[in-house]
Amino acid sequence: MQIYKVGGAVRDRLLGQPVTDIDWVVVGASTEDMLVKGYRPVGTDFPVFLHPLTNEEYALARTERKSGVGYGGFVFHASPDVTLEQDLIRRDLTINAMAEDKDGNLTDPYNGQQDLEARVLRHVSPAFAEDPLRVLRVARFAARYAGHGFTVAPETLELMRQLSESGELKALTAERSWKEISRALMEDQPQVFIQVLHDCGALSELMPEVEALFGVPQPAAHHPEIDTGVHVLSVLEQSAIHKHPLTVRWACLLHDLGKGLTPESEWPRHIAHEHTGLRLIKAVNERFRVPRDCQELALLVGQYHTHGHRALELKPSTLLELLHSFDVYRRPQRFEEFIAACEMDARGRHGFEQRSYPQADYLRGAAHAARTVSVQPLLEKGLKGKELGDALKNERLKALKTYKAGHVA
């Protein structure tokens, strides 16, 4: 019975990165051997056990064979006669197919260390093409390690292209897809994730609404990058640079979907794209069963981001409607995330990355002015129901008129 540290823990140690999760593989053991030593079984598809003291996962060495469509269409075989090399060959990338024994000796049958040094993401074997989830995983690793100079090997990108064209991506469940997408969006360079999916043809299968943005022009005066797809990648990049949460990053990715529906005869203008894009945002949200907070912010940013950019020009009544749409009185954080997404949209333009965004503080001040209006004096007057609501709205409007008057240039 030999125990090896495998996968990400080995990869990240060699990269000089912090090691968070450690996976172990056990060679030459059976389920009975593990139980005798006090390991607790937790695996449903294949034998995985928790260490009796550390609770870390230990999996029996196994092989796998394609038996159906999708990432779940595999038959696994785990037994004491499965070798370490057989276990490692089923893994996705060479940099994830290395193992280390208790003395730190490296087992690297597929040249993972060489690819690590060359900064290449390369598949281990042709069996890579049997699992469509690996398209998303490789794109996610590309997003994680782009800052270290990693790129996807051309032959691996070609396999990803073949997988995308095969239709197998449609077999991925919403939950598994969203898990990979959400993790990728929180990497250091999430725009690389979208770019790689675009390059291998997977984006048109997974999110055709986003794919449709590439090649769609915008007015050069406002968007020197011109291409809407390139703009969205830049907005997403800015959201990562500024360390924004998943809600903001998801909204940044989807905010301009309406531009993909603009007739070519109307290019490069995109009148009412905020409204036309809402059904597309909703469709993407539903496709991946996106968490409610991400869904809500994406729809609100899609609908109102132009209001955000024109905040200083808005009439007090329009500003009040905007604040009401976000329920800033009970959900101030959601409005703050809206402001963040708008600012990233403004910065996600070539040459505008460092441009100030005075709209942000103006919107925060407007929200504060509206929130500080007290309902108590109105209650003391005996107002209630619709009468109370109308009076409170009127007081907030007065507060915003005063606020705007104090900010006239």
Swiss-Prot record:
Pfam families recorded: HD, PolyA_pol, PolyA_pol_RNAbd
Protein name, UniProt field: Multifunctional CCA protein
Keyword Disulfide bond on entry: no
Gene for this chain: cca
Record remark on domains: Comprises two domains: an N-terminal domain containing the nucleotidyltransferase activity and a C-terminal HD domain associated with both phosphodiesterase and phosphatase activities.
Gene3D superfamilies per record: Beta Polymerase, domain 2, cca-adding enzyme, domain 2
Catalysis performed (reactions): a tRNA precursor + 2 CTP + ATP = a tRNA with a 3' CCA end + 3 diphosphate; a tRNA with a 3' CCA end + 2 CTP + ATP = a tRNA with a 3' CCACCA end + 3 diphosphate
Subunit structure, interactors included: Monomer. Can also form homodimers and oligomers.
SUPFAM superfamilies, A to Z: Nucleotidyltransferase, Poly A polymerase C-terminal region-like
Family: Belongs to the tRNA nucleotidyltransferase/poly(A) polymerase family. Bacterial CCA-adding enzyme type 1 subfamily.
EC number: 2.7.7.72, 3.1.3.-, 3.1.4.-
Cofactor info, note text: Magnesium is required for nucleotidyltransferase activity. Nickel for phosphatase activity.
